[in-house]
């Protein structure tokens, strides 16, 4: 029986296996994938299809869209491929980063939680946005970051959707809240004044 995998758009068409089953977000294929009242949604969010059909969708001709210039920040080159299957935990893989105390605190709390949900949306948002702004991988073209976060969030369907939206679908990766808000509003900064800059992404 073929295995089922949540499709990571950052992985590219070359990673597809024709015999495998993939769960895709139909929002990624607007104008290409036709849905009907009879379409079956897995976990209420995804459509299942074979790798062969997904390959055809990905290689279908799409209308060209104008590209706007984006200012890219420098990032730390870290490969997180081993985190995608749990061979190495995310905290260990990120040990080379000088993460601010707020992100260390959030990562620890999310890692120790039995589930990534339950009043932790703000923590997930800040942590995902932080990594999206400071980490990249030239080898995997950052696909490993997506897979590592999906594993870190235990493949929870809602969390999968959040990661895909924040790191792939959004035109620009959102920045985490500034340090003042992290301390005064979100209550996620354990000790003010220990970081440089006005945003957690200034520290990595």
Curated annotation (Swiss-Prot):
Domain of life: Viruses
Family: Belongs to the baculoviridae LEF-2 family.
Protein name (database record): Late expression factor 2
Protein task: Required for late and very late gene expression. Specifically required for expression from the vp39 and polh promoters.
InterPro entries in alphabetical order: Lef-2 (IPR004283)
Cystine pairs: none
UniProtKB keywords: Late protein, Transcription, Transcription regulation
Membrane spanning stretches: none
GO biological process: viral genome replication; viral transcription
